[in-house]
Swiss-Prot record:
GO terms for cellular component: cytoplasm. ATP binds at G30, P31, N32, G33, S34, G35, K36, T37. The gene is recF. It comes from Aliivibrio salmonicida (strain LFI1238) (Vibrio salmonicida (strain LFI1238)). Belongs to the RecF family. PANTHER family: DNA REPLICATION AND REPAIR PROTEIN RECF. Pfam families: SMC_N. This is DNA replication and repair protein RecF.
Length: 359
């Protein structure tokens, strides 16, 4: 479901822009500091309700302005155009509109506009803590399992409530009622995650064979507690330890995706360029599975396309992106870096000092 139009007002250094988009490749070209990343960041904000660069709303609103607006129109599978929009104010107030209706939730926005981001800081997916890989898994499950969002939200609330009760409970009996619901939901979420990783593992390995043929890369899922123990049993068994620590040690909030080469974590084996291709393989596999499972297409946002990639690797990535037939937004410092990807169906936009013009 590609975006056909993008309107940005008072976001970063962009005062205003209104551009018609290609359903294929869209290139944003400009020198460092010109605002090219801000265009991708605005699209990300439209789909996630937050920036991938800053958690502080005040930093993404243009200087001297009180609020920002991002509007888009995307084409539905039935070929209707649906307007979506987000407004953020300096006090943190956020308003989301879908189809002209206010009061929509950010989760609904994410469901409408599935985005995949590949950017220079994206190595965190494979090099940093488990929370990044949990977010990766849960993005995928969220988009293919309708009941996931409500179940996961409930698990987080129950875990928070349990941690509070651990500080005052005198016996496990005081937690047992809540733990029954928590355990049932945790097992359900775990099974959804297992199924999801099973689905994307083969696609990830196939793409890795093209990107990194010299390595045999394996994915394995850790659910957050030992496989042979039911979660209800674990909660009861660990009550005294959890009470002493003041929080719940194991559970679905500790899940991880382990990515290894011959038993060694990939971050200890691959170069930075190879790690970027590994991240790209994971993102492409997610997008492929989303299309197979739901018929929806991801929108790919690739910031600083040439970063860490030589010409050969850029061509490999471009080839796979074209095969997806998805809408793609790519930022680059020069047009030469993406010259072999530009065709008659793509669009090129040049940006300088926050001013955007079609090239």
């Amino acid at each position: 479901m590609p975006l056909s139009r993008l309107i940005i007002n008072d976001f970063r250094n962009i005062e205003t822009c209104d551009i018609q988009l290609s359903t294929g490749f869209n290139f944003v070209i400009g020198p460092n500091g010109s605002g090219k990343t801000s265009v991708l960041e605005a699209i990300y904000l439209l789909g996630h309700g937050r920036s991938f660069k800053s958690s502080l709303t005040g930093r993404i609103i243009r200087n001297s302005c009180d609020e920002l607006f991002i509007h888009g129109r995307f084409t539905t599978p039935e070929q209707f155009e649906l307007p979506i929009g987000i407004n953020k104010q300096r006090d943190g107030t956020t308003e989301v509109k879908i189809g002209g209706e206010s009061g929509q939730k950010l989760a609904q926005l994410a469901k409408v506009l599935p985005l995949q981001l590949i950017h220079p800081e994206g190595f965190e997916l494979v090099t940093d803590g488990p929370k990044f890989r949990r977010a990766f898994i849960d993005w995928g499950v969220f988009h293919v399992e309708p009941a996931f969002y409500e179940a996961w939200s409930r698990v987080k609330r129950l875990t928070k409530q349990r941690n509070a009760l651990l500080k005052t409970a005198q016996s496990y009996r005081e937690l047992s009622y809540w733990d029954l619901e928590l355990a049932n939901l945790a097992e359900k979420i775990d099974q959804w995650r297992v199924d999801y990783i099973n689905h994307i593992s083969e696609a990830t390995q196939q793409i890795c064979q093209a990107f990194l043929p010299e390595y045999d890369i394996k994915l394995s899922y850790y659910r957050g507690w030992e496989r042979e123990t039911p979660y209800a049993e674990l909660l009861k068994r660990n009550f005294e330890r959890d009470k002493q620590l003041g929080y719940t040690v194991g559970g679905p909030n500790k899940a991880d995706l382990r990515i290894k080469v011959a038993g060694t974590p990939v971050e200890d084996v691959l170069s930075r360029g190879q790690l970027k291709l590994m991240v790209c393989a994971l993102r492409l596999a997610q997008g492929q599975h989303l299309t197979e499972a739901t018929g929806k297409q991801c929108i790919y946002l690739i910031d600083d396309f040439a970063s860490e990639l030589d010409s050969h690797r850029r061509q490999l990535l471009a080839q796979y992106l074209k095969q997806t037939k998805a809408q793609v937004f790519i930022s680059s410092i020069t047009a030469e870096q993406i010259a072999d990807m530009h065709d008659e169906e793509s669009k090129m936009f040049e940006i300088e000092h926050g001013k955007i013009a079609q090239g």
